[in-house]
Amino acid sequence: MGKVSLKDELAGMLNPQPQERDPEALEDAFSDREDSSEEENDTLGREHYVDVSESKLRSKQAPQLDPKFKGRKTSRQELLNSGSLNSQSSSPSEEEDSEEDENDAVSEDHENFSSSEASSISEENEDDDQSSAIPEKDMDRLKKIINGEKKLSDQIRTSALEDMKKGLALKEQMRFYDNVLDTRIRLQKGCSQLLSSSNQLQGDKVEARDGLVSFIQHTLQLRKNLLIDSGVEILDSRSKRKENPVSLEEIALEMNNLDDSLNEWKNDTLTKWHNRVQAVQGISQSNKFKALNQSIVQQIENSMINKKDLVERTRIDYSDPNNKTFNPEIYNDTDFYQSLLKDFINSRMADSTRDGTVRWMATKKQKQKKENVDTKASKGRKIRYHVHDKLQNFMAPIEVTVWPDEQTEDLFSSLLGQQLDLSETANDTNTSNFVEKDDELISSNDGFSLFG
């Protein structure tokens, strides 16, 4: 920037519309040389780069605007006058005139539209009307959907309540079964002793028979009531004149009739629940022909094929191991009791999570597992060694003691490259040597005497 004369400076101060200047332009004028040197230093490392032209997007200029959008210069007085005029409230007539002008402008704009634009606008308006009318037409369908969802949620809630009731009923049934099984386990000792003392109860047969018949009658009546509640039709072949069976033949006939009446319902119920259990467990089709994966009815029929052998096994007195004869007067259900006891223990082992049970299972597995013993490693034929674990958090001990003189001398001799003697005798000899040397220096000064 060149030097400005006083006349030009005064003229610029009196000008109401002074020329705008960039305050940073002065700094740029003085920093041209520095920038050029910095640019040269920056380009030193990029001399081997390939020259690339500037992007077209960067060189693209802004579109040419209409001259009416360009601004014009104004003075501060005109700006204040225009602001005061705009702040004043307009009269109602002026507002009406402005509204009329706006309406005229809008009508003129509509007249300038083409026919295609007008048709497109009309179609859009029709679409908006149709879209606004759609919810009204579909309100019934939405209500049906909402009602259906509400019914579905109610069904899910009721099914969840039913499943909860079934679970509680099953839990109560298992508790009742456990109590009956516990009672049977407690009675096993007494039942086993009855076999050995059967010959001593000859005089009490009548009383025992009457009590047994009464118990069977109550049991048969309970079975009938349960079958009626389950909707099973009972086959009755007895005479209507007799209320309860008295003889053993009548009791056996009544029990057979109840079994025949229950047979069809029993098979259907067992098959239904067996299929549900198989579906939950996910048994594959390749294993369905195995004995354990067949239908429960088929498994029962297969187990009852040798019914005669099963009955004969219940007529053996196991209290006498030497006696293998069949006694029709006894009934020994030891095998059935052992199977029940095994199932009971397995269920307790599966359901229990106590530490004692887990510890007992671990001990049992250790006993069953065979130890891997090398028989050829005896008599020193093979070296036996044990690999120790790696040391963790280990550090050699540090002795906190004072260094002796020898160690200090070694340190200084290694650092300074000369031998030093730090003992008291060495210090005395060193001082005496220094004194003798000083005396020699004082005495021999080429004939000059320091005193006299």
From Swiss-Prot:
Subcellular location: Nucleus, Nucleolus
Ranges of Acidic residues composition bias in the record: 93-106
Gene Ontology biological-process entries: maturation of SSU-rRNA from tricistronic rRNA transcript (SSU-rRNA, 5.8S rRNA, LSU-rRNA)
Biased composition (Low complexity): 78-92
Family to which the UniProt record says this protein belongs: Belongs to the AATF family.
PANTHER family registered for this protein in UniProt: AATF PROTEIN APOPTOSIS ANTAGONIZING TRANSCRIPTION FACTOR, PROTEIN AATF
Protein name: Protein bfr2
Gene: bfr2
